[in-house]
């Protein structure tokens, strides 16, 4: 397609999504749940077609010389297809937030004032080589009463088209407009540029992917964006930490999975406990193949540690690499997190109630924890069900974004002929 055709194509999708959003916003919970259930049925039934489409994508990715990690994210298996279907059923089982009324109170005038939860409208979701996001995003947006325009990575085009066919079937079976969930069929990057500027059709953009993608979307979008750029997560081991807890939590936070945005990237340790806790903890890291980069005080305790450079403190490694720093106080730990952190997830290990309270209050991140692994920063673990992503912004949603984060609120006023005096 040329630029004019892309614009025409995207505006057509946008108009259809806007029209569908009005119908989805008032759809009954039972209809939405039926659509989700039928999507899951179609995905299970069409497993072989989905795997065949995915095999084409994987073969093309290998021919293009894409990284092994990307190919791994791209690849579907019978287990991951079953997981997609199960995810849709789990979304169907979640409470419907749309229409929920809260904070309803009588005012002195006699009127009642409250808030009602309402859909956002049309959500544009841009993601890379993760076909499962097509099903997850479709399910979450639908349950929250929104229409969605999905733009997956070009490397997953055949997989996304196959999953989208199952999504459309579910919508049609439930009597809902098939245009409520649309997958952009072109791999032309100009479509992304058009999507993030169609403010007359799209209400919010959710990018999911690497830093380069999210920076591009943030810079080009003329529509609100729900995002996080980096996951530079910290654990601070306080001088009053239980050492056994500290070692167990810090080990899990780093080594359970290396490539997630809630993985520990920088470990801060109080100088009064560093000599006791770092040797056994770092032995665990080194035995698991984690490269350690530390400040001079850390290196003095662990000779195998490499020297940390200034850029290390800012880095989300997404790899078996960890920065380590010895600090003199809770104040210095909080200052370090303030300067180098990404406002994603940070945790303190301590038995001191006052220090825990200060850390919770003063660390300005979307998730702040006490005596818990940063790996818990996840919508499912928080009881939100599935999540569309994690936001480190302070406006509209913050932290893991589940169904409620895909809605807004409006004020409702109930009277009985009341007039203002």
UniProtKB/Swiss-Prot annotation:
Primary subcellular site in the record, as a coarse category: cytoplasm
Record field: transmembrane: none
GO cellular component assignments: cytoplasm
An example Gene Ontology molecular-function term: NADP binding
Subcellular location: Cytoplasm
Pfam families: Aldedh (PF00171)
Biological-process GO terms, alphabetical: L-proline biosynthetic process
Protein name as it appears in the record: Gamma-glutamyl phosphate reductase
């Amino acid at each position: 397609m040329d630029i004019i055709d892309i614009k025409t194509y995207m505006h057509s999708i946008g108009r259809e999504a806007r029209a569908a959003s009005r119908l989805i916003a008032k759809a009954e919970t039972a209809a939405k749940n039926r659509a989700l259930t039928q999507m899951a049925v179609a995905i299970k039934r069409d497993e072989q077609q989905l795997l065949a489409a995915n095999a084409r994508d994987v073969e093309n990715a290998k021919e293009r010389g894409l990284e092994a990690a990307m190919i791994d994210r791209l690849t579907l298996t019978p287990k991951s297809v079953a997981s997609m279907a199960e995810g849709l059923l789990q979304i169907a089982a979640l409470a419907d937030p749309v229409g929920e009324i809260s904070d309803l109170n009588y005012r002195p005038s006699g009127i009642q004032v409250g808030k009602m939860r309402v859909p956002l409208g049309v959500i544009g979701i841009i993601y890379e080589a993760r076909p499962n996001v097509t099903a997850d995003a479709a399910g979450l947006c639908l349950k929250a009463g929104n229409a969605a325009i999905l733009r997956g990575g070009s490397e997953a085009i055949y997989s996304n088209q196959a999953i989208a066919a199952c999504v459309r079937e579910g919508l049609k079976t439930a009597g809902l407009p098939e245009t409520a969930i649309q997958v952009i069929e072109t791999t032309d990057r100009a479509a992304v540029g058009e999507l993030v500027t169609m403010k007359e059709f799209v209400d919010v953009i959710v990018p999911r992917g690497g830093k380069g993608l999210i920076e591009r979307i943030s810079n080009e979008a003329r529509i609100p964006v729900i995002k996080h750029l980096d996951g530079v997560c910290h654990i601070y081991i306080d001088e009053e930490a239980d050492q056994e807890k500290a070692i167990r939590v810090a080990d899990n936070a780093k080594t359970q999975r290396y490539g997630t945005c809630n993985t520990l990237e920088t470990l801060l340790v109080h100088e009064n406990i560093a000599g006791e806790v770092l040797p056994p903890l770092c032995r665990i890291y080194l035995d698991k193949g984690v490269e350690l980069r530390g400040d001079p005080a850390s290196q003095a305790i662990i000779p195998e540690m490499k020297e940390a450079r200034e850029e290390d403190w800012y880095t989300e490694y997404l790899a078996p690499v960890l920065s380590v720093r010895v600090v003199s106080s809770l104040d210095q730990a909080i200052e370090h997190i303030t300067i180098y952190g990404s406002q994603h997830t940070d945790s303190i290990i301590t038995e001191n109630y006052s220090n825990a309270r200060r850390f919770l209050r003063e660390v300005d991140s979307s998730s702040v924890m006490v005596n818990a692994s940063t790996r818990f920063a996840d919508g499912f673990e928080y009881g939100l069900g599935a999540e569309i992503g994690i936001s480190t912004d302070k406006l509209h949603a913050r932290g893991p974004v589940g169904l409620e984060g895909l809605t807004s609120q409006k004020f409702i006023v109930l009277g009985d002929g009341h007039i203002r005096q």
